[in-house]
Amino acid sequence: MSEGVDLKELKRRMDGAIAAFKHDIASLRTGRASANVLDPVTVEAYGSRMPLNQVANITVPESRMLSVSVWDKSMVGAVERAIRESNLGLNPIVDGQNLRIPLPELNEERRKSLVKVAHDYAEKSKVAVRHVRRDGMDDLKKAEKDGEIGQDESRAQSERVQKMTDDVISEIDRLLAEKEKEIMQV
């Protein structure tokens, strides 16, 4: 008798959806400074577009300030332009080879739009988890149809897959609620 569906593999794929969600919401700017805020910024450098963290070092010297130390002095202008044009609402101040970026207070409208973006990220992750669940259920149906597992085993495994799915989705909801609270905190 075969085991029907590889639960460890399904769990690994669902955990991947959680990890992607955590990465997505980490880049959402809250009231506190975080180097992740600049993750979406790409710089025109050496003939191609590169992530900011590949041409500069990003630090958080104060709770409402980011510091970007550009490694190549000739890139300072391109880095400043990339940050200004990134639609993050940031205005860097050039200081030699460094850029200081004060983080303004978020207004109510901006906070609500960030919460909406967080909800979109959560929904995208839930859809990914449901796709993994569907793949697992399809594998179970095929194994049962091919006679690899019995009906009782198929039912038991499908319940385990459903429980795993419910647990992962509730973890995504918990992380979303946490991030929403963090964003709305004044």
From Swiss-Prot:
Main location: cytoplasm
Region (Disordered): 135-164
Coiled coil region boundaries: none
UniProt cross-references to SUPFAM superfamilies, sorted A to Z: Ribosome recycling factor, RRF
Intracellular or extracellular location(s): Cytoplasm
Entry GO terms, CC: cytosol
Keywords: Cytoplasm, Protein biosynthesis
GO molecular function: ribosomal large subunit binding
GO biological process, one term: cytoplasmic translational termination
CDD domains in the cross-refs: RRF
Sequence similarity: Belongs to the RRF family.
Physiological role: Responsible for the release of ribosomes from messenger RNA at the termination of protein biosynthesis. May increase the efficiency of translation by recycling ribosomes from one round of translation to another.
HAMAP family to which the protein is assigned, alphabetical: RRF
Name the UniProt record assigns to this protein: Ribosome-recycling factor
Gene source species: Rhizobium meliloti (strain 1021) (Ensifer meliloti)
